[in-house]
């Protein structure tokens, strides 16, 4: 938990998920003792590099254990850091609803809700990371996935309600019996 909103917990419960919230400093052993089907990397405030100081190693170890991971907002940025990427402060952050994002896999445009001032840097992104979504405002990275692993994230709030519902499929993807496809 990097600062999860109550609406996100409701979002997962709508999909019949059993959710256990743990501190962002919880050890990998403790997380694994809960026998999770997946780990959600939540949103939260601040600079991802500051939070990443203690979260990156935990995320890297979960990836090694092949635990499915799904991150949003700050969780997206910290996941990128854990995978060897970089983040930077944006000149102008993305705030509010109605941000068009292109899904580079389906070619669909999704209208999203966003609230962030940092972004994942495109240059020198490791080759094992696939960019899955981009902003149609400024071409910034809005989604990534780790190739050949059930690990993915988006920069925006797919659960935003009231608000755009174009990205609600992420919970279905994450909670499906085979999130590796």
Question: Can you say where each PLM-predicted feature lies in the sequence?
Answer:
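Hydrophobic anchor at the start of a short beta-strand
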Residues: 19, 69, 151
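Conserved small/polar residues in nucleotide/adenosyl-binding loops
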Residues: 174-181
């Amino acid at each position: 938990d990097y600062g999860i909103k109550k609406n996100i917990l409701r979002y997962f419960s709508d999909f019949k998920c059993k959710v256990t919230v743990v501190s962002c400093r919880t050890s990998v052993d403790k997380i694994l003792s809960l026998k999770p089907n997946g780990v959600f990397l939540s949103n939260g405030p601040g600079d991802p590099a500051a939070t990443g100081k203690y979260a990156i190693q935990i995320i890297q170890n979960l990836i090694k254990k092949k635990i499915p991971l799904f991150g949003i907002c700050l969780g997206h940025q910290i996941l990128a850091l854990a995978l060897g990427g970089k983040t930077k402060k944006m000149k102008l952050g993305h705030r509010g609803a109605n941000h068009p994002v292109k899904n580079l896999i389906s070619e669909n445009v999704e209208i999203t809700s966003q609230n962030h001032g940092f972004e994942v840097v495109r240059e020198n992104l490791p080759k094992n990371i696939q960019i899955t979504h981009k902003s149609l405002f400024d071409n910034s990275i809005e989604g990534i996935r780790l190739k050949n692993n059930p690990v993915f994230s988006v920069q925006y709030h797919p659960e935003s309600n009231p608000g755009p519902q174009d990205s609600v499929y992420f919970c279905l993807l994450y909670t499906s019996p085979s999130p590796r496809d």
